[in-house]
Amino acid sequence: MDENTKPKAMKQKTLVSPNVTIPSVTEDDLETSVSNLTNNMIAHINSKALKRPGTFAIGEKATSVGRVKRNMNITVGDKHKNDIPVVMVLGLVASKAVQDYYKWNKELPKDINVSVEYSTALPAREYDPSVAQKFENRFLDETHVVDIYVNATPVTVRINFDKVKVTQEGVPAVYALIEGGEKLLAEYHSAYGQGIGNKDFKNRKLLLVDIGDGTTEFIYVVKGKPVNDLCEGKRYGVGHAADVAKKLFDEDVKVDISMTRQQFMQVVFDKDHHFHDKANGALEDAKVEQSEMILEQITDMFLNTLSGNVDDVVVFGGGSAAFKDDMYDDLKEFTNSVNARTLWVPKEMAPSLNAIGLDILNDKVFFKGVVAGNGE
């Protein structure tokens, strides 16, 4: 049966655990299992786009199963060759296809055929048209076969990509700024007045700071276009703060507690946990260190790499909210001192700013009105 499934703005942790065991026990009723499928993705993927076929736990599920965890802490020039973004996309498309089929038919199919139009972005420092074409071709060149497991039941999803567009990081964020509306600029306008509106960012010189879990991208944009040679990526982010915090916590409690980084973060969020105060204190200390490193990188790029030729420093990304209390005042003081401005994207929009921009590009540029999947 053909299902023309074109998912939109699906979000999931960029984490994969390879060589996991296929589920053998049915834990939940069917409707609950389908509803939670994107958070419980285990899939066998057979695709020439991957170095080898395999069974993977994907996204949130990879935090709880499998001995090996692979995430998107990607080195320079690596994302277009890495298997993780391909595994993530195929798993998400397959799970969404099963959810959509079940929504309309109230039963699991044995197999589904899916057609997809997909957009994504490569790091600006990695991007050039030939590299983008190679990455696009990994999706376009064949049918990808995914057996996605709903509890212990496999559903075969055959995925064909009709169109794929790879742009460079920075471009989607600028489109999101231009189309973002007053809510995005409320704090900015409170600090600097109403003189600069959303549309004006198309012609301004921007230092975009995209703070993630394992990496922070520093993207220099002039009149809407990233200047690739002046963009950098550093291994700063929330994940690194958590790693440092876990070490500080271990030193503080002085007992041998076996705990992964993910389990440590659960203690941080659980206010009733016996060790919550110590874990939270360790994380706050570690965040200060990471904040200082990010701020130092911003000032160094601004003053040296970019020779001060910046109108606005724009901070966003999934990790930006965690660092705002430690960074915002110091960053604003710095930008004020060099006749520039700070735009810290609100936490409601910051994690999805790239996805918002890709949706705009899908409608206005890439696919012109077609609802398409996108990924970061």
Mark where each language-model region is.
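Contiguous effector/interaction surfaces
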Residues: 286-290
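A mobile "lid/hinge" subdomain adjacent to the ATP/sugar-phosphate binding pocket shared
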Residues: 249-285
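Glycine-rich phosphate-binding loop plus the immediately following alpha-helix
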Residues: 19-30, 170-185, 213, 219-259, ...
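Nucleotide/phosphate-binding catalytic cleft detector across ATP-hydrolyzing
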Residues: 2-206, 292-315, 320-376
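A short acidic Gly-Thr/Ser loop motif
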Residues: 1, 199-216, 221-224, 235-238, ...
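Conserved short-loop catalytic and cofactor-binding motifs
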Residues: 233, 282, 346
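Short coil/turn segments at secondary-structure junctions
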Residues: 73-80, 229, 278-282
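Detector for glycine-centered tight turns/loop "hinges" at secondary-structure junctions
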Residues: 5, 224-225, 272-273
